[in-house]
């Protein structure tokens, strides 16, 4: 069963105007990245980033993250857009940033990466497979691509933290969960937010 998206009513000299809550947040340069990372969600996030950057690239964009991760290509499209635009992208992790979510959240502008006290981070190696009935040659191609993807993601994580590539590789061998304090020590975030001190 779906959930109801709240509507916000605003009064102005020209009368009342109704917004869905996400459109209203977008007016304040806030983007909500929630749920699994997949192509449709990534396209929506990218469009919002581009729109806000075109509106005013001197102001921060606030990206709230709560995701179990998902598609590597969709996630990297978001990261590439974050790096492409001129606006600083401030990231706030609430709930969790797992797997591809960790790549996205840690790619916020350095010095502007935050996490709520009870949120969690997860790093691990990328997953994939060739499927049943796949020829051996195709399986080798898939395995080689997975290794390339793993190296690329681990390099991003090393660049976004204060850990070496070797340490990232070791820690990502299996699921590696971190609470907010551990994530701060690891270097993926710059501050744990106890209250809203952003505005």
From Swiss-Prot:
User: Does the keyword tRNA processing feature in the UniProt annotation?
Assistant: no
- Please name the GO terms that the record assigns under molecular function: ATP-dependent peptidase activity; ATPase binding; serine-type endopeptidase activity
Kindly report the protein's main subcellular placement as a broad class.
cytoplasm
Judged by the first EC level, this protein's enzyme class is hydrolase
Spell out the CDD domains in the cross-references.
S14_ClpP_2 (cd07017)
- Single Gene Ontology BP annotation: protein quality control for misfolded or incompletely synthesized proteins
List the catalysed reactions.
Answer: Hydrolysis of proteins to small peptides in the presence of ATP and magnesium. alpha-casein is the usual test substrate. In the absence of ATP, only oligopeptides shorter than five residues are hydrolyzed (such as succinyl-Leu-Tyr-|-NHMec, and Leu-Tyr-Leu-|-Tyr-Trp, in which cleavage of the -Tyr-|-Leu- and -Tyr-|-Trp bonds also occurs)
InterPro entries attached here? Answer: ClpP (IPR001907), ClpP/crotonase-like_dom_sf (IPR029045), ClpP/TepA (IPR023562), ClpP_His_AS (IPR033135), ClpP_Ser_AS (IPR018215)
Enumerate the UniProt keywords alphabetically. Cytoplasm, Hydrolase, Protease, Serine protease
Active site (record annotation): 99 (nucleophile), 124
Gene3D superfamilies under this entry? 2-enoyl-CoA Hydratase, Chain A, domain 1
Gene Ontology terms: cellular component? cytoplasm; endopeptidase Clp complex
Protein's cellular compartments = Cytoplasm
| Enzyme Commission number(s) from the entry | 3.4.21.92
Binding partners and assembly: Fourteen ClpP subunits assemble into 2 heptameric rings which stack back to back to give a disk-like structure with a central cavity, resembling the structure of eukaryotic proteasomes.
The role this protein plays is: Cleaves peptides in various proteins in a process that requires ATP hydrolysis. Has a chymotrypsin-like activity. Plays a major role in the degradation of misfolded proteins.
NCBIfam families (alphabetical): PRK00277.1, PRK12553.1
Family classification: Belongs to the peptidase S14 family.
- Which protein are we looking at? ATP-dependent Clp protease proteolytic subunit
The organism encoding this protein is Lactococcus lactis subsp. cremoris (strain SK11)
Q: Which gene is transcribed and translated to give this protein? A: clpP
């Amino acid at each position: 069963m779906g959930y109801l998206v709240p509507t916000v009513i605003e009064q102005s000299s020209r009368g009342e105007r109704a917004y869905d809550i996400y459109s209203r947040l977008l007016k304040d340069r806030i983007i909500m990245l929630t749920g699994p990372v997949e192509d449709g969600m990534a396209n929506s996030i990218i469009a919002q980033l581009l729109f806000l950057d075109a509106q005013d690239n001197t102001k921060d964009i606030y990206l709230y993250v709560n995701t179990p991760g998902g598609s590597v290509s969709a996630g990297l499209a978001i990261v590439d857009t974050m790096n492409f635009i001129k606006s600083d992208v401030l990231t706030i992790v609430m709930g969790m940033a797992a797997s591809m979510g960790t790549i996205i959240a840690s790619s916020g502008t350095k010095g502007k990466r935050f996490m709520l006290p009870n949120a969690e981070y997860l790093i691990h190696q990328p997953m994939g497979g060739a499927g049943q009935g796949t020829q051996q040659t195709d399986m080798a191609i898939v395995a080689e691509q997975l290794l390339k993807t793993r190296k690329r993601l681990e390099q991003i994580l090393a660049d976004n933290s204060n850990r070496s590539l070797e340490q990232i590789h070791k820690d990502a061998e299996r699921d590696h969960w971190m609470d907010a304090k551990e994530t701060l020590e690891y270097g993926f975030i710059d501050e744990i937010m106890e209250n809203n001190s952003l505005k």
